[in-house]
């Protein structure tokens, strides 16, 4: 899980979601997991 100021999709499998007022990226590739902080 990477904590970043700006999250973006890395590949076509990445999906932007909102959880508890936080923008997150979930993907089938675990390296692409990101959280905005």
UniProtKB/Swiss-Prot annotation:
It is found in: Plastid. GO terms for biological process: translation. GO terms for cellular component: plastid; ribonucleoprotein complex; ribosome. InterPro entries: Ribosomal_bL36, Ribosomal_bL36_sp. One of its GO terms (molecular function) is structural constituent of ribosome. It comes from the Eukaryota. Its main location: plastid. Keywords: Plastid, Ribonucleoprotein, Ribosomal protein. Belongs to the bacterial ribosomal protein bL36 family. This is Large ribosomal subunit protein bL36c. The gene is rpl36.
């Amino acid at each position: 899980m990477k904590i970043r100021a700006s999250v973006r999709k890395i590949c076509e499998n990445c999906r932007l979601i909102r959880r508890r007022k936080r923008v997150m990226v979930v993907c089938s590739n675990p390296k692409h997991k990101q959280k905005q902080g």
